[in-house]
Amino acid sequence: MLELNFSQTLGTHCLTLNETLPASGITAIFGVSGAGKTSLINAISGLTRPRKGRIVLNGRVLHDAENGICLTPEKRRIGYVFQDARLFPHYKVRGNLRYGMAKSMTGQFDKLVSLLGIEALLDRLPGSLSGGEKQRVAIGRALLTAPELLLLDEPLASLDIPRKRELLPYLQRLAREINIPMLYVSHSLDEILHLADKVMVLEDGQVKAFGPLEEVWGSSVMHPWLPKEQQSSILKVSVLEHHPHYAMTALALGDQHLWVNKLNQPLQSTLRIRIQASDVSLVLQPPQQTSIRNVLRAKVANCYDDNGQVEVQLEIGGRTLWARISPWARDELNIKPGLWLYAQVKSVSITA
């Protein structure tokens, strides 16, 4: 668990934190350039020194301004992966990995190398590696120091799209298989969508939202960040049943369910789905004899005008679902907050 309660001057703004981050999973730190993302993880790692407050990791005080405590970076047991891999060019991959390796990690070397898929790279020099391969080695080196926390500062920012796609599955595997919390700095919505368990949104050094990805993604804070074509809902669901006659799987959403193409997932397993706002239409009465398999009872929470369209925020079993309709449809159906209606979901995609 990481306790952040500090403030630090950030240009014309002040970075102010009073949050507790979880002891596992990936927490994404999101915001535009200058929002305070890198300043936050630099303060956590000990590269900078906040003028007020405390930083505590798993009960260990890393920084306490009032009592004059400020552990040096090497004493904090924190791994840091930068945008550029920063490997030693004269060491082979094996040497880079073993540099600074904790004795306690000796028995984990082969497992971690396999997890990152870098077995074939061990005897190569960094100059012969692709950008994605270098970053995998950098992540491995950071993990072999036996950190209690891993910081990743936009590790995919310098990579082209094919290399990003190459690295994402390895990061997903790490999140599932290692019991180390990770802070992942990014301004990429796609990376956050595929990796994050929780999201912290920073703006001018202030926390605008912090919580599970599903909640933050569907909040009004995140809504302006999403391009019109990406306006969507992220929902955490569980596998309810597999259809006895058709290749379809039912996913539980509160006391309702969604049908999707058959999944090779055991019953009760959890996963994350994405529904585009443009794939949701609204009706006042449950339709009869429709080809759309997913019709959900929902309550209108809010309506927002957006460049000639209307974004409708719906509540379904405590979750948020977005729909995009025309002003004509809104006016004709008299859609307003508090109205109960039915949402027809035309398409569902699985994200994680």
Curated annotation (Swiss-Prot):
Listed InterPro entries: AAA+_ATPase (IPR003593), ABC_transporter-like_ATP-bd (IPR003439), ABC_transporter-like_CS (IPR017871), Mo/tungstate-bd_C_term_dom (IPR008995), ModC_ABC_ATP-bd (IPR011868), Molybdenum_import_ModC (IPR050334), Mop_domain (IPR004606), P-loop_NTPase (IPR027417)
A GO cellular component entry from the record: plasma membrane
Alphabetically ordered keywords of this record: ATP-binding, Cell inner membrane, Cell membrane, Membrane, Molybdenum, Nucleotide-binding, Translocase, Transport
Binding site for ATP: G31, V32, S33, G34, A35, G36, K37, T38
Residues in ABC transporter domain copies: 1-229
Keyword Transport: yes
Taxonomic superkingdom: Bacteria
Record membrane topology: Peripheral membrane protein
Gene3D superfamilies given in the database record: 2.40.50.100, P-loop containing nucleotide triphosphate hydrolases
GO molecular function: ABC-type molybdate transporter activity; ATP binding; ATP hydrolysis activity
Residue ranges of every copy of the Mop domain listed in the record: 289-352
Reaction(s) catalysed by this chain's protein: molybdate(out) + ATP + H2O = molybdate(in) + ADP + phosphate + H(+)
Subcellular location: Cell inner membrane
UniProt-listed Enzyme Commission number(s): 7.3.2.5
Complex formation: The complex is composed of two ATP-binding proteins (ModC), two transmembrane proteins (ModB) and a solute-binding protein (ModA).
Family membership noted in the UniProt record: Belongs to the ABC transporter superfamily. Molybdate importer (TC 3.A.1.8) family.
NCBIfam families xref list: modC_ABC, Mop, PRK11144.1
Role: Part of the ABC transporter complex ModABC involved in molybdenum import. Responsible for energy coupling to the transport system.
PANTHER family in alphabetical order: ABC TRANSPORTER I FAMILY MEMBER 10 (PTHR43514:SF4)
Protein name: Molybdenum import ATP-binding protein ModC
Underlying gene: modC
